[in-house]
């Protein structure tokens, strides 16, 4: 991850040429950057192909204990709250796909800018058997119109 400050704006480049998966480690790094910032705004960037493909499903499948699964989801929840609680605007520049947890990260931001291209954005959790916790549903319902909420969450429609 590459972090720098320009004109009181913290710019966080998730910095991987791949899917920018939100592992517990990466989520904690992002939380730290959001929690300890004296900047006026934060910009979060992925790469030109993928903003973030969400949680690392290998981490979930390798979790042996319920507490390990809880740690993964709780850390993602903390990251989303850190975006919401940041005193200035958090801006996600979505230059590529934003799927599942990556879409949640973009939705938790105050502003989302989609870059030109054939990229997908959506929540596929229900399609793969993952129930969204209430705090994540709250973020979604504050960011997506009521007209589209059902198809986004339960039908996993991609945009």
Which residue ranges define each predicted feature?
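Conserved CoA-thioester-binding segment of acyl-CoA-metabolizing enzymes
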Residues: 1-45, 81
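Short glycine-rich anion-binding loops that position phosphate/pyrophosphate groups of nucleotides
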Residues: 17, 48-50, 96-97
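Crotonase-fold acyl-CoA enzyme core
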Residues: 82-159
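Hydrophobic alpha-helical membrane-association signature
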Residues: 26-30, 72-75, 105
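Glycine- (often His-adjacent) and acidic-residue-rich active-site loop
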Residues: 46-79
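Hydrophobic/aromatic residues within transmembrane alpha-helices
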Residues: 44, 56, 105-107
């Amino acid at each position: 991850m590459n972090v720098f400050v320009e004109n009181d704006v913290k710019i966080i480049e998730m910095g991987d040429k791949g899917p920018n998966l939100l592992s517990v480690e990466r989520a904690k790094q992002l939380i730290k950057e959001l929690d300890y910032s004296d900047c006026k705004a934060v910009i979060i960037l992925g790469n030109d192909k993928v903003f973030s493909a969400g949680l690392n499903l290998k981490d979930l499948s390798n979790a042996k204990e319920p507490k390990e699964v809880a740690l993964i989801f709780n850390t993602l929840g903390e990251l989303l709250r850190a975006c919401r609680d940041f005193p200035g605007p958090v801006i996600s520049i979505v230059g590529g796909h934003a799927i599942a947890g990556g879409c949640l990260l973009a939705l938790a931001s105050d502003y989302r800018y989609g870059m030109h291209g054939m990229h997908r954005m959506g929540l596929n959790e229900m399609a793969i058997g993952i129930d969204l916790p209430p705090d994540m549903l709250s973020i979604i319902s504050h960011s997506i119109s009521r007209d589209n909420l059902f198809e986004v969450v339960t039908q996993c429609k991609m945009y």
